[in-house]
Amino acid sequence: MKMWKKAASVMLASAMVFSLAACGSSGDSGKSGGSSDSDTFKIGGIGPTTGDAAIYGTAVKNGIQLAVDEINAAGGINGKQIEYKFEDDQADSEKSVNAYNTLKDWGMQALIGTTTSTPCTAVVEETHSDNMFQLTPSATAVDSIQYDNAFRMCFSDPNQGSASADYIAENKLATKVAIIYNSSDTYSSGIY
C-alpha cells in the first residue's frame, strides 16, 4: 500500500510539473538545452537505480513512467507528447551532475529529481544556473531546493525532526529522549 501511495504521489507531482511546464513552454526553459521538437515535451529524471539507494530511485523512475504513459494516452500536454528519460546517479553527487548534463544535452525541458539529498544539493546549483525547472520527489535536505526554480514534494529534514519531537511530547510518550545520529550523514544531521 505504501509503495502505491508513493507512486501516486509521484504521478500527481509529475502531472503538476507537466501542467506548469505547459504554461511556460513558450519561453526559454534553459540556457543550453531545453529545446525540443514542437510536438514533444522532454522530461528528465535522475536518481539511483543501482547501488544502496536503488529502491528509491527505481520507485521514482517507475512512478514517473506511469504518469507519462497516462498523460500521453490522454493526449499529452496541450497536444504535446511527453518524452521521458531517466539517468542513474547511484546516489552520488558527481554522477548526478553528469546525469544532469547528459539530460540537458538531450534537450530536457524540466527535471524531476534528484531522488536523494546530497546529489540534489549539487544538481540544484546547475539547474539554478540554467534556469531549469526542478522538482524533487524526496530530497529532504534544506539546501536541496534553495533557489526559486526548485521545488520539493515532501517535507524537509528539520520538519521531520520537529514533528517527531512534537508527537512524542504531545502524546506523552517520553519525558527524556536520547538522540544518536551520524553527523557525517546529510539526512541524519538534517533531522537532528
Located regions from the model:
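Envelope-exposed proteins and targeting segments
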Residues: 39-42, 80, 149
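Flexible, small-residue-rich helix->loop connector segments that border functional cores
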Residues: 65-77, 168
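Acidic/polar active-site rim loop that often engages polyanionic ligands
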Residues: 143-149
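An alpha-beta-alpha
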Residues: 150-192
